UniProtKB/Swiss-Prot annotation:
Leading EC class: lyase
GO molecular function list: L-serine ammonia-lyase activity; pyridoxal phosphate binding; threonine deaminase activity
Gene3D superfamilies: 3.40.50.1100, Biosynthetic Threonine Deaminase, Domain 3
Protein family (similarity comment): Belongs to the serine/threonine dehydratase family.
Known role: Catalyzes the anaerobic formation of alpha-ketobutyrate and ammonia from threonine in a two-step reaction. The first step involved a dehydration of threonine and a production of enamine intermediates (aminocrotonate), which tautomerizes to its imine form (iminobutyrate). Both intermediates are unstable and short-lived. The second step is the nonenzymatic hydrolysis of the enamine/imine intermediates to form 2-ketobutyrate and free ammonia. In the low water environment of the cell, the second step is accelerated by RidA.
Lineage, top ranks: Bacteria, Bacillati, Bacillota, Bacilli, Bacillales
Keyword RNA-binding: no
EC number assigned by the record: 4.3.1.19
Name of the featured protein: L-threonine dehydratase biosynthetic IlvA
């Protein structure tokens, strides 16, 4: 399986058994009925720091010789890795410097400080993760501190692999499919290594954000490549460049990689919360969102999805609902030229909107000395089939309009 062997993961499990939570593997009735198969969720959202990252961080730090830790450790992260390192520093009583982008939400910064207590200092620097990463590495070299990589160190990968060991110990059935998210690749390479060693017939499916397909593109080109730009919405898995170690392992263990649209992930997050009271972060929900793209293959099979984390900022829920509605074809935005006369809005509501259509946004400024004025309007539909009926009525009434959903530049500017 490359650089990481099953024995490395067994050793990691011995290191971690009294530190991390052996998280539950739960059969999900809703998903099992929907896809006509047995779907199990590995609940890493119930881990100590609400994500799997504690496993690799603690195993890596605890394996470093004591004399090399005199000056402490340093890392860069915008979230879960930082919390894992902070918790490890506090538990092992090792000083740590954690570099985070200046754009990191205060809630995440506060969580890192909470887990690290007096052993950790958070340094906010740079506008992006890459900026923070480079500064952290330079700082570590200058101050002779040990750098803890989020995904590209062997002990990190072995630590994440203990998720797979727990899955195999807990499940009674043979696993046909394993769905796991890919960011830098540390989790899937560790989990996949263990599971493929025990169950070679299991198909390991990697799940990447459609807006950040770093592993898929690297595998396509046969080498690790760096993407020029990415959609950062799935913050736990949106990386420009995967790790060299995970890449080598993924070349051997992956059956397929599915690119999951961000809007589909948002729909899944909302469904998990509404149906099962599960709070999943975008990267954690991604493997579950991917099931839709394999619904024919997995029918009648045993499927495991690794729900990798639950550190979801509640302030993002409105944005997630919006992205979900747009992806499902239920939310549409237009700029419509309205006649500047009394009764025009009433006509629009009566003649254009359907009985179940709802106006969710309406912005209008009257233009003097003009017969028409632009209106920014948002319309939410009850079902996606209503869209064509809405457009038919809009065209029959002769309104001049532009669909913002179909214009990326306008959408990013106005919505």
């Amino acid at each position: 399986m490359g650089k990481i062997q099953i024995e490395d993961i067994i050793i990691a499990n011995q290191t971690l058994k009294d530190v991390v939570v052996h998280t539950p593997l739960q059969k999900n009735q809703v998903l099992s009925e929907r896809y006509e198969c047995n779907v199990y969720l590995k609940r890493e959202d119930m881990q100590v720091v609400r994500s799997f990252k504690i496993r690799g961080a603690f195993h890596q730090i605890s394996s470093i010789p004591k004399e090399e830790l005199n000056n402490g450790v340093v890392c860069a992260s915008a979230g879960n890795h930082a919390q894992g390192v902070a918790y490890s520093c506090h538990t092992l009583q090792i000083p740590g410097k954690i570099f985070m982008p200046t754009t990191t939400p205060r809630q995440k910064v506060d969580q890192v400080k909470f887990f690290g207590k007096e052993y950790v200092e958070v340094i906010l620097t740079g506008d992006t993760f890459d900026d923070s990463f480079n500064e952290a590495k330079e700082y570590g070299i200058k101050h002779k501190m040990t750098f803890i990589h989020p995904f590209d160190q062997e002990k990190i990968v072995a630590g994440q692999g203990t998720v797979g060991m727990e899955i195999m110990n807990d499940i009674d059935d043979n696993i046909d499919y394993l769905f796991c998210s890919i960011g830098g690749g540390g989790l899937i390479s560790g989990v996949g290594t263990y599971i493929k060693s025990i169950s070679p017939r299991t198909k390991v499916i990697g799940c990447e954000p459609a807006g950040a397909p770093a592993m898929k593109e690297s595998l396509k080109q046969g080498k690790v490549i760096e993407l020029e730009k990415i959609d950062k919405f799935v913050d736990g898995a949106a990386v420009k460049k995967v790790g060299e170690i995970p890449f080598e392992i993924c070349q051997k263990i992956l059956e397929d990689i599915v690119l999951v649209p961000e809007g589909k992930i948002c729909t899944t997050i909302l469904n998990l919360y509404n149906q099962d009271a599960i709070v999943a972060e975008p990267a954690g929900a991604m493997p579950i969102a991917a099931l839709d793209f394999f619904k024919d293959e997995i029918k009648g099979k045993t499927v495991v999805c690794v729900l990798s984390g639950g550190n979801n900022d509640i302030g993002r829920m409105q944005e997630m609902r919006e992205r979900s509605l747009i992806y499902e074809g239920l939310q549409h935005y237009f700029i419509i030229q309205f006649p500047q006369r009394a009764g025009a809005l009433k006509e629009f509501i009566l003649d254009v909107l359907g009985p179940d259509d709802d106006i969710t946004r309406f912005e209008y400024t009257k233009k003097n000395n003009k017969s028409n004025g632009p209106v920014l309007i948002g319309i939410e539909l009850k079902c996606d089939e209503d869209y064509h009926r809405l457009m038919d009525r809009l065209n029959k009434k002769g309104f001049e309009y532009r669909e913002i959903n179909k214009n990326e530049s306008l959408f990013n500017l106005l919505i």
